[in-house]
A protein has these predicted regions:
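Conserved catalytic helix of short-chain dehydrogenase/reductases
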Residues: 1-11
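Short-chain dehydrogenase/reductase
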Residues: 5-6, 61-64, 68
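Alpha-helical segment proximal to the catalytic Tyr-Lys
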Residues: 10-14, 73
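Rossmann-like NAD(H)/NADP(H) cofactor-binding core
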Residues: 15, 20, 78
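Short, flexible catalytic-loop segment of classical short-chain dehydrogenase/reductase
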Residues: 23-34
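A short C-terminal helix-loop "cap" of Rossmann-like NAD(P)-dependent dehydrogenase/epimerase domains
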Residues: 35-49
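A conserved structural motif in NAD(P)-dependent oxidoreductases
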Residues: 49-60, 71
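Short C-terminal tail/terminal secondary-structure segment
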Residues: 65, 76-92
Length: 92
């Protein structure tokens, strides 16, 4: 997805269209319910996540909202990983 986002940002940038992607980690959604409803699995994930917790849908929503404001005016071609720092502890 990173290269697609970059290519589209280059193609659409001259038309003042910004292209970014959000790459969420483990977020408390129905999709991940099996993991976050099991206290043992939740603790295992929290131990290896630098921020020490699972993500909440609001975490994604707030990032999305900020990208749609003036705060995101000069941001394009980026894939933003929002995972509580998990990727930096295990980039695989």
């Amino acid at each position: 997805e990173q290269q697609l986002v970059r290519n589209l940002a280059v193609e659409w940038g001259p038309h003042n269209i910004r292209v970014n992607a959000i790459a969420p980690g483990l977020i408390k959604t129905d999709f991940a319910r099996e993991l976050w409803e099991d206290p043992q699995k939740t603790k295992a994930v929290e131990r290896i996540t630098p921020l020490g917790r699972l993500g909440d849908p609001d975490d994604i929503g707030m990032l999305t909202a900020s990208l749609a404001t003036r705060a995101g005016n000069y941001l394009t071609g980026q894939t933003i990983t929002i995972d509580g720092g998990r990727m930096i502890t295990d980039p695989s």
